[in-house]
């Protein structure tokens, strides 16, 4: 008879570089083998336990929550949670061990077991030579909650090991049980487990020796095999332990912070009070009946679901940021909420945004999950907000969420190739065969191009193991700003560990796992554009005396939309990429809602769902606007009958298939997960059958489902697009009407966006803005505005652009200059106490031009600056001027780019124009006269390479010359053939043909040629987005 069995010692792949199987694989196999329960006992972590709980529910197999916990200098234990108290004790132990060590490590000490550990069961993984005193120490702490685990893996000493451990258990009167020390679900993962061990030990597999297991027995074995190895009583004891463990994650009771509610109020009344204040602020003349009705509906639902404290918490964070003059704006599904707008969390007025925002997208009675509010803050000041949260709630009750960083193709190939002994140069070359975020192994053609033999057995082994590793968690990193805040210490819910950054702590659960256990998350995110907008408003106020805010900018400005329709959008928010620029002259936005669509339409969802071209044809009157039924007209009217947003898919399901709001939100979540888990399949039958019953055609229902699958790739929420469109419009209005201030603010806020400071400044110059060089007599650390003869001020370059120059030196220069102007280089260096490095940096960058002349003279001047000794204090050390040659234009150009990454002299391509013309290369200006389909040759500096997820391997390259930019399309096969030229060239020649339609011009590449040697040392870098 086959014995029953529960595995009580099993590692998943969240024991990083140890466990060689996912929780899903482990539970599916354990269920097939007829196990009664499975304990997931990852090493000093519960990082994977939520996913294990999910897998347990899907397979119907009981999960036991536990952890493998070696004590420093002491016994090795497996601890299992018997009940809620035991789970909380386990969380506390893991937290203590992790917090006293650096990130990624832990130290569990004997003293940690001096406090009561009620509800925690312990399995002692003793060796046969273990001392009786060790067992007595454990027995004292765990009493009848202690077992001795016996693990047999068909070693030559199994019989002796079993006999000795049973004798030890008998002497100490500790019950013994069977354990598997499981590291993989099936024997076939042994090679991967060996490889992971080598990766963990930083050794090749061939040298890992004793670190490797001697066989593949550490997998989930058939119960018949276990019966051959273990006495029946050891197997039966596993069932008794499993029966005692009845803790489940749904027993966790999460409570929101309550201290924000003043005396005399409860959370509900105080939230209502705050909302009423917000309504008076947002609608000084009184809110409409429609708004009042919506607010009442939302407040009733918030109160019913007991989320009042959540909204008050987010409101508190946003209010504090506004008081510190930190620009912020909520985005995502929160923009569907009128309550969030009234509280100042979001800036999108749901009453007049033009969008049909769906509150159920944000909060639903049928969804047993908290809402998720994302708030963007200025990227340079977000840390202030994060530290405020830590101060407000304390580190015991606030922590960032984790992100499980997983293996992609390149990383998996790199680690596996290194572990299997490939030489370092070949490791890098092989990893480069994969795209940065690709989850696929390179094909044979790519491998041959890189010099590898695709038929090599050793290479096949590397590719196979790397393919198995893809998707495995590699380590825990911190979420950029996802906070979990609790009424009680977080370690009663989940273990907390140190982050890599100082002054931060992180819970062990991934951000995507929080919804399943009902934890509140507030996303405190960073957005560079908010920093740029705040700086731009400040520059305008300082220069013109005009105070603008996001809310006060003139709306629906014709000049702004005309600029957008020309695709004159370098540096603006969201519509600055080459793909967006190509779409702008075709869509030609004229209203705010057009911008909402523009933000959303160049996304994988609409593109893969084949929605872009039908929308454009209908917008341009090239095909009629049709609706599948009158009842769907209100759903699709604003997008001309074409579904573009997630909310429309939800509305369609509710109208055409009688989905409840909760079912519709379930559909939305399934869309996001369908590629990973096939989550849309349950909806295929439900949706199509209900639509057919209501009279829709089979063709229409099939087409709708294809579009829904397209949204699964990246369907953009309308609320998200509308929130972003607010910033898009603001950035465009400022670029149109205050281009100098806007360009200045962008450069001061860099790094951000698609374009480097050089490209932003060159664009400003093309728009007639005077840009003045960095000069110690006038420059601050930041770029600034100065009066000019034109309508727009001039931009004075700041010292922040000088490579290697320190901010503290710039601040001293500013402070001493305010006292009195500098008379010469010696005066500057002496009063501002500049060291040799700072002096040389200023001279090389030309920032001493006003005090010393050209670069050569400035270098001579700073070389002669010496500290003044007291003995010679009264002696003049001035030397007679030395005759030095002037730098050539080419030398100045090279030094400009080397020292501050841009030039105010001629563009590099202007100096090369005659040589390029001799090579029959046209300029960007000359392309304007070339007819569609004609062959052309162009050359330019490579300033950007983009490979969108939806482009089927196509790479979009942006070239820049002295007149502007050239958009280049490189098809997949050419990109593969000339990969090195494509990715490494700084000056690139394209031979191909011109495509021109609807005001959009592209060069379709046929051949690529690297002309970089013509630049002779010029330091120009591309901004690449793969």
From Swiss-Prot:
It is found in: Cytoplasm. GO terms for cellular component: cytoplasm. Signal peptide: none annotated. It comes from the Bacteria. GO terms for biological process: DNA repair; DNA replication. Keywords: Cytoplasm, DNA damage, DNA repair, DNA replication, DNA-directed DNA polymerase, Nucleotidyltransferase, Transferase. It catalyses: DNA(n) + a 2'-deoxyribonucleoside 5'-triphosphate = DNA(n+1) + diphosphate. CDD domains: DnaE_OBF (cd04485), PHP_PolIIIA_DnaE2 (cd07434). It is an enzyme of class 2 (transferase). Its EC number is 2.7.7.7. GO terms for molecular function: 3'-5' exonuclease activity; DNA-directed DNA polymerase activity; nucleic acid binding. Its main location: cytoplasm. Transmembrane segments: none annotated. HAMAP family: DNApol_error_prone. DNA polymerase involved in damage-induced mutagenesis and translesion synthesis (TLS). It is not the major replicative DNA polymerase. Belongs to the DNA polymerase type-C family. DnaE2 subfamily. NCBIfam families: polc (TIGR00594), PRK05672.1 (NF004225). This is Error-prone DNA polymerase. It comes from Ectopseudomonas mendocina (strain ymp). The lineage of its organism: Bacteria, Pseudomonadati, Pseudomonadota, Gammaproteobacteria, Pseudomonadales. The gene is dnaE2.
